[in-house]
Each structure stands twice: as structure tokens, then as C-alpha cells.
């Protein structure tokens, strides 16, 4: 579908419906995995609905009022952001729902971004609308239970460009499924919600996307992909509208749509893979700093130092910095939480710092 850019009036309407309930995140005061646990306590205990009730939810949560604006099902596996869709489904016509299918365009069903087999189809995960999207049945079947990933040489491609093939990033080389760029951030935030909402259970589940812990929850390779997608594809009006509709439906919210900055506050920034040998011994001190200044000690001469805010904004970038016997100093830093990214010999590492 041809994308419709929101007018100032329509954006004001979207914003008016996007107000977070007063006080909803008042207890989200920490950082790191402490913040993640605080969010878990906020969003747990939602009003779990039946699996079949998802089709009722989709009538308000997943209608296309953002591309062709025709009210059909907005399916991330078939949507064509810059042109006409190959097929559409009605949110209210039961005959558009699967049953049997053989080809794309036959019917749509309910896609668990975290596969049901991971949690043995148990409630409330099996019907949690925040991670279950209406998608074409054929594409959903091709995605199967594979993790999401980066696919350079697909063995199968959907009509909108979603790809199935071997993952090409370091850490996992098995089959993976890659959605189109338009919806990568959406997928990332759904899955970050999932591992937060089910923090009390996720350590017991096995899948290539998970690492059997309750804190980080995600495998290192997959965490890096989700953080990259989150940064590259910011929260959209479609996600805001969906978050509000699901809040009405089941009584909890996706915090990473309401507060995208929480992602970096919990999991940090996406890091380049294969990047730590030359900088293994780098230290940043004092941390926290009470003097608006930090020092960096590195055995390797640094090629670049970048200071990044928690929402990904580059505050300072120093190329070929001057050090004194391996010590580099950043001064006059404003109060806040930051990431310091240091590069040397085509490698990089990142540290979180606090300026009081």
C-alpha cells in the first residue's frame, strides 16, 4: 500500500489517544535489569483473554489506517509500505481466517512472534496480544518456529520481501526469518515486551533467541539484532495505536513503545560483533563520576571515542583523540547516564557511565 503521511491534525488525534495512564510508570525508577524487573511488576497480571478473542482484538488493534487507510488487516508479512498490497484481509469477515491454506493470500491467522512451542502453548502467553500478530497463514507457516535474524541468501521470499534462510550474523548460523525493514522495530519491541512480561518464566524456556536467564533473557547474538532493529526503526503511530487498543483489550501496555529509551537503559546499545579482543582491558573511571569528567585507560591507542545518550543521540564524537600514556579524558560532561563507545584497530567496545 502507498504510505499515508500523517497530517498535523491526524497526528494530534493519534497523540490524544496515546496518552499513557497517569502514574502508570511511576515505579520504573531504576536502570539495568532492576528497571526490567520494575516494568515486569507493572505489566504482569494482565487480563488474559481466550485465544479466539484475539480476532476481536484485531478489529481495533491491527487495522490499516496508516498506509492505504482502508481498514483491512495490517499484516507485517504482507504489507507493502510503498505500493499496493498483493492481497488484503478483512478484520470482520470470518471467512478470511485460516483454516487450510496453500498459498499466500488464502487466509490469515495468529502469529506468535515467540513461538508457542517455547512455552508449550500455556496461558497467558498463548493469547497475549502484545506478541501475537495477524499475519498471512502461508508466510506464518514458512516462518515456523525459526528465530528472527539477518538473511543474506534467502531460500524463500514472501511477496512483500520477508525472507527465510540461514542467519548471517555471528553467534547463530541456523535458519532464521527476516521481516522487512518497515517492521523490524515493531518485532523487536514485541519480543522485548515478551521477555519482560514473562521474566518469572523465561529462564526455563529453550530457544535460539533465549539464553536461559531471567535478566538478559536474550541470546547475545539475538539481543544485538533486536537492539539494532529497535534503533533503526523507531516507534511508529501504528505501534502507538496498537498499544492503546491492546491496553483496552487486556489491561497492560508495552513499555518499550511508551518509553523507547528504556531499551538502552536495560540492555545497553547494540554492539558490533567480533569486537572485544583489542579492547579487552579498557577501563573507564571514576564511574559514577561526581566531577563531570571521566578518564579512559587503554593499552591500545584509541581511534575514536563516542559519547552516546541512552536514546541513541551522539553527544560527542572525537576522532584520533590525544591520550597521555594511554589515558584519555572527557570533561564538562552534563549529568546523566551515557554510553562511551571506544574504537581501536577496527574493533569497538562500549561502557555505561553515570555522571552525577
What function would you assign to each model-found segment?
Residues 18-84:
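N-terminal module-boundary/linker segments of secreted carbohydrate-active enzymes
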Residues 7, 277-356:
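C-terminal outer-membrane/trafficking sorting elements
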Amino acid at each position: 500500500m502507498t504510505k499515508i503521511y500523517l497530517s498535523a491534525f491526524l497526528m494530534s488525534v493519534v497523540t490524544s489517544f496515546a496518552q499513557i495512564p497517569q502514574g502508570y510508570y511511576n515505579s520504573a525508577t531504576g536502570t539495568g535489569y532492576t528497571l526490567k524487573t520494575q516494568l515486569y511488576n507493572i505489566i504482569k497480571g494482565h487480563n488474559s483473554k481466550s485465544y479466539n478473542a484475539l480476532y476481536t482484538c484485531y478489529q481495533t488493534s491491527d487495522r490499516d489506517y496508516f498506509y492505504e487507510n482502508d481498514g483491512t488487516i495490517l499484516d507485517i508479512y504482507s504489507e507493502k509500505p510503498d505500493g499496493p498490497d498483493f492481497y488484503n484481509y478483512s478484520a470482520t469477515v470470518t471467512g478470511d481466517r485460516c483454516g487450510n491454506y496453500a498459498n499466500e493470500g488464502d487466509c490469515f491467522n495468529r502469529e506468535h512472534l515467540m513461538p508457542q512451542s517455547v512455552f508449550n502453548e500455556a496461558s497467558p502467553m498463548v493469547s497475549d496480544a502484545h506478541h501475537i500478530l495477524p499475519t498471512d497463514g502461508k508466510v506464518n507457516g514458512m516462518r515456523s518456529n525459526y528465530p528472527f535474524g539477518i538473511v543474506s541468501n534467502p531460500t524463500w521470499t514472501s511477496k512483500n520481501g520477508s525472507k527465510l534462510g540461514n542467519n548471517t550474523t555471528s553467534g547463530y548460523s541456523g535458519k532464521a526469518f527476516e521481516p522487512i525493514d518497515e517492521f523490524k522495530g515493531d518485532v523487536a519491541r514485541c519480543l522485548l515486551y515478551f521477555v519482560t512480561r514473562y521474566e518469572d518464566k523465561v529462564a526455563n524456556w529453550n530457544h535460539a533467541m533465549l539464553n536461559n536467564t531471567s535478566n538478559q533473557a536474550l541470546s547475545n547474538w539475538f539481543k544485538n539484532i533486536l537492539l539494532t532493529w529497535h534503533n533503526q526503526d523507531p516507534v511508529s503511530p501504528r505501534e502507538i495505536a496498537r498499544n492503546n487498543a491492546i491496553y483496552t483489550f487486556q489491561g497492560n501496555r508495552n513499555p518499550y513503545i511508551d518509553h523507547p529509551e528504556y531499551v538502552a537503559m536495560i540492555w545497553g546499545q547494540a554492539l558490533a560483533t567480533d569486537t572485544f579482543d583489542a579492547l579487552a582491558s579498557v577501563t573507564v573511571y571514576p564511574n559514577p563520576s561526581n566531577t563531570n569528567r571521566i578518564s579512559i585507560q587503554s593499552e591500545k591507542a584509541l581511534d575514536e571515542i563516542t559519547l552516546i545518550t541512552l536514546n541513541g543521540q551522539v553527544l560527542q564524537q572525537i576522532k584520533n583523540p590525544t591520550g597521555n600514556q594511554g589515558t584519555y579524558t572527557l570533561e564538562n560532561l552534563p549529568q546523566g547516564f551515557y554510553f562511551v563507545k571506544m574504537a581501536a584497530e577496527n574493533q569497538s567496545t562500549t561502557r555505561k557511565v553515570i555522571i552525577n
